Amino acid sequence: MDSTELRKVFKMFDKNGDGRITKKELGESFKNFGIFIPDDELDATMDKIDANGDGCVDVEEFGLLYRSILGDDAAGRAPRTAAAAIGGEGGAPDDEDEGMREAFNVFDQNGDGFITVDELRSVLSSLGLKHGRTADDCRRMISMVDADGDGRVDFKEFKQMMRGGGFAALGG
């Protein structure tokens, strides 16, 4: 992933645009995914991500986290990610779609275009979160967004979820 793409994903978390993700912003971002994290767990996650200990996550720290989630193939995924963001429709996507595509790709670890129970569980676990560690938790979260009932989330379902306020909003 290049620095432009990383910054687009970062901006989805950096709600006030000051270049730093606070604990509150991180918590709000997780809520958009339908993930409600207790304060103590959010503190532990911030401690894990906040390498310099200033209480906020900057874009460099976020990049380290992002690469650790994607694993060793992060560099190899960048061209496929950019092509996927364009979607083969000839025109450049708008920034919102591109940012959502990058966020989607954090969860779609194998790059097949779907977020599975195992992928969701893996990402939540690498963030140090207890919520979503069981397959049943992840299955429930996915079922709230899975419009076509195939047991996984595609990009269209992900965009609908994000625009509708996260997993929780679609869960009724």
From Swiss-Prot:
Is Mitochondrion given among the entry's keywords?
no
The residues that the entry says bind Ca(2+) 2 are: D50, N52, D54, C56, E61
Q: Which GO terms describe its molecular function?
A: calcium ion binding
What are the entry keywords? Calcium, Metal-binding, Repeat
Q: Which residues bind Ca(2+) 4?
A: D146, D148, D150, R152, E157
Positions with a binding annotation for Ca(2+) 1: D14, N16, D18, R20, E25
**Which Gene3D superfamilies does UniProt cross-reference here?**
EF-hand
Q: What superkingdom does the record give?
A: Eukaryota
Which residue ranges does the record assign to the EF-hand domain?
A: 1-36, 37-72, 95-130, 133-168
Name the Pfam families for this protein. EF-hand_7
- Carries keyword Metal-binding? yes
Classification via SMART domains? EFh
Q: Where does Ca(2+) 3 bind?
A: D108, N110, D112, E119
Report the function annotation for this chain.
Potential calcium sensor.
- Name the UniProt record assigns to this protein: Probable calcium-binding protein CML28
* Organism the protein comes from: Oryza sativa subsp. japonica (Rice)
The gene is CML28
